[in-house]
Amino acid sequence: HPTASATTHVWECKITAEKKLNEFRKIKARDGSKATLRQWNFVYWVQAQLYMLYGGYTRHWCVVASAGCRDWDACRTELMRDEAEFYAERLRDMVDQVDELPARVSESANAFACKWCDFRSICHEGAPVEKNCRTCRHARPVEGPQWHCTLHDELLSPDKQAVGCDQQSLREVLA
């Protein structure tokens, strides 16, 4: 974590296409450094907010570079505690509510966000859901990153979660 003259920052580097770097610069010139990340890439801005919230920082320094880091620019983002806590709670809710699917980003599979989504085929095309402990009705998230199998009454290692067992039963919402 680089230290500025008075405040320690979370540091991050994003590598992007030249076109996106130019877009970043236009936003920075128009809106100023502190507003740039949010306008340029909202997902990155939310990530930055969560890094600051959980790390105990109030500033984030993001370097955006072209491929090979031949050209770069940077911006500073300040912690917006209320918004960071909102997104942290939203993520906790998603984990706690494993039997509910989050709302689709779009009803159209051709929406920009859906075109690049790893779950497009499941969400829009009816592809089968991968069978593993995370998709099984008997598994539940517990404290931290761990999962518990209620059928076998055991904590599940990451390796065991990926393999599952022969008694796997898809969550109702995924069936």
Role assignments for model-derived ranges:
Residues 23-31, 35-45, 50-153, 161-175:
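Metal-dependent nuclease catalytic regions and adjoining charged, substrate-binding loops involved
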Residues 1-17:
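Active-site beta-strand-loop-beta-strand hairpin of nuclease catalytic cores
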Residues 20:
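BZIP DNA-binding basic region
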